[in-house]
Amino acid sequence: MKRFFSVISAVILIFSQSFSQITPVPNGRRVQVAILFDTSNSMDGLIDQAKAKIWNIINEMSGLRYQGQVPMIEIALYDYGNSGLSESEHYVRQQLALTTDLDLISQKLFSLTTNGGNEYCGAVIQKSLQDLNWSTNPLDLKMIYIAGNEPFNQGTIAYKEVCSTASGRNIYVNTIYCGDYDQGVREFWKDCATISKGDYFNINSNEAVVHIATPYDESINSYNDSLNRTYYGYGAIGQSKKSNQLMQDANAASESEAVKTERSIVKSKAAYSNESWDLIDAVDKGGKDITSMDDAELPTEFKGKTDEEKVALLEEKKGERERYQKKIAELAVERQNYITAEKAKRTDLSKDDFGTSVNGSLMKRAKEIGYQKENESTDTPK
């Protein structure tokens, strides 16, 4: 009997070591991004562009490295200018504090609705500066993106003072004006960006995002379906979070196959981590020991098994997940090469939209403080 338990202990020890060896260890660096959307009546097109580009943006962010290591990606979401919001709060609402839960970010974005109101840019920027747990480390990348189409100086909160405060905390405020470039300048959108050392963009928010279909999309999304079957929700929130994972796949697919493909690629990367509800990620991150968990907390597939059987099944499913992630990552490289070649042939893809504005400024600022963009072919599965 002693020998039997020794064997189990050895298997568990080896399995635990294998998890620690294959998991990219964040080096303490963070990439923090707060997105502030005008949700007044005229901004439906802006929200549509964001839905179409959110996974492309996250893919760009997840390719950043600092001294070869993977930074933590945190995203926050606010909306402002909606008449359904509280006047006493300057028509500003926090949808989501800084979080690493990428499915939740998608859920909140797809739930946004528009309604006429007063757009107070200074107020929503101030709110994000006050509410969020911004890093104080100058090596962490901290970005605010505010998008809208009304004069920037509306409301009682002085935008100049707020943008200056952001600059003093090494937080770049980037402004995206939905309309004519010069009109945005006249309405002070460029001024805010200049004060905070951020970037100013203008976009046509009513223009649909153009996606390039590739021969690799179908295969990538097929592997994503297989990847989903390696996720096992545990504890009180496990099942609802698993359901939300599938719902956000569906939301992405409702935009286009290309958008779903971008999401599938994100799910092959270290940035897509779900240790709060997925059993494999929970053990992978070191916070859970499957042999000490109650059966009631475990997903159905793991109930009633011996410790040795639980560890063996977890190892099997972890291996399956890594294989699917690797396949997706390999195809993602081929897909990107195809897209790059197609872009070189076409002239209809040169205009800025919400996604290109965010990606361009984010990569520029990241490089300025020492981040590099790692080729996706070398991105290590989480």
Q: What do the predicted segments below correspond to?
A:
Residues 1-24:
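Bacterial Sec-dependent N-terminal signal peptides
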Residues 21-207, 214-217, 285-295, 301-303, ...:
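Divalent cation-coordinating acidic motifs and surrounding scaffolds
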Residues 193-194, 198-261:
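Glycine-rich, Lys/Arg-enriched anion-binding loops that position phosphate/diphosphate groups
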Residues 240-298:
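Charge-patterned, long linear interaction tracts outside catalytic cores
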